[in-house]
């Protein structure tokens, strides 16, 4: 029983290693990984993100889509729950 479990586990590990090696040859995984991380990072940048939480007053407005909070005096998202 122990021998068959050991052989099964060894076979699965060997299958995993062979599959991983064939995929890494096709994709050149170590070379493409850093470039794919930095490419995905640039997709998440939003232009108006810096406006949220900025200090404001009624003379100095916020970006479009944001309003100045009366209590906290910073830019917050405009919505139907805001007065």
From Swiss-Prot:
Principal location listed in the UniProt entry: secreted
Pfam families recorded: Toxin_12
Stored InterPro entries: Huwentoxin-1 (IPR011696), Huwentoxin_CS1 (IPR013140)
GO molecular function, one term: carbohydrate binding
Cysteines joined through disulfide linkages: 51-63, 56-68, 62-75
Entry's family note: Belongs to the neurotoxin 10 (Hwtx-1) family. 51 (Hntx-8) subfamily. Hntx-8 sub-subfamily.
Biological role stated in the UniProt entry: Agglutinates erythrocytes.
Protein name: U5-theraphotoxin-Hs1a 5
